[in-house]
Amino acid sequence: MKDRELTQQKILQAVDNIIANDGFERLGVNVIAQKAGVSKMLIYRYFGGLDDLIAQYLLSKDYWANTDIRAIDGADVAGSLKRMFREQIIQLRNDVTLRRLCRWELTTDNENIRQLRDRRERNGCELIKAVSGFTHSHHTEVAALATILSASISYLVLIGEQSSTYNGINLQGDEGWEQVIKGLDLMIDLWIKQVDELTNGQVNQLTD
């Protein structure tokens, strides 16, 4: 690994550590440089400044902004969707900085956040377009389902930090989250079943 790449990783890791321990409010060039053990001039040289550094960090952390469209298997759309939403749960539950990012976004509106939202929106729309194409469903239907599921996951993970139970489900334990995942899987299976029935019905009408 080149020295520049190593230094960039150290700086990004320093940002991650500061957010995890102190929150976004503590981020500053001097604090980051000290945490990374590098000259603050390298932050300007490699990232252009604090705002660009934060923007790059945010874009690297967000789950849906970085989900690869190739993760969707046209031969097993249901399985692909289940894996994607399960991975969202795993990442959010295991990454304190990602949870802090979610909370920060709810109370902040600046250029960095807008860039993140734009990137997430573009990628999300591409994912929805792919699922719509594979299932022959209208994109608005896919978008509604994806929005409900992804937003529900984010809310439950975040509320679980403050409240241990939601509708009798333990949000602070693996058993409770397996219960949530089973519910998500059921919704996806029922939707795919409906899609298949509608598709088969249309085919039968054409062949009658």
Which residues make up each language-model segment?
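Amphipathic alpha-helical linker/stalk segments
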Residues: 57-84, 124-130
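Hydrophobic/aromatic-rich alpha-helical bundle segments in the mid-to-C-terminal region
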Residues: 132-185, 195-199
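Alpha-helical DNA-contacting segments of helix-turn-helix folds
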Residues: 53-61, 113-116
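Short hydrophobic/aromatic patch on the recognition helix
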Residues: 36-47
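Basic, helix-initiating cap at the start of DNA-binding domains
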Residues: 1-22, 26-35, 52-55, 67
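Amphipathic alpha-helical segments used for helix-helix packing
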Residues: 92-114, 160-167
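Amphipathic alpha-helical packing segments from all-alpha helical-bundle domains
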Residues: 65-70, 109-136, 143-144, 178-182
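Hydrophobic alpha-helical connector segments
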Residues: 69-94, 98, 134-146
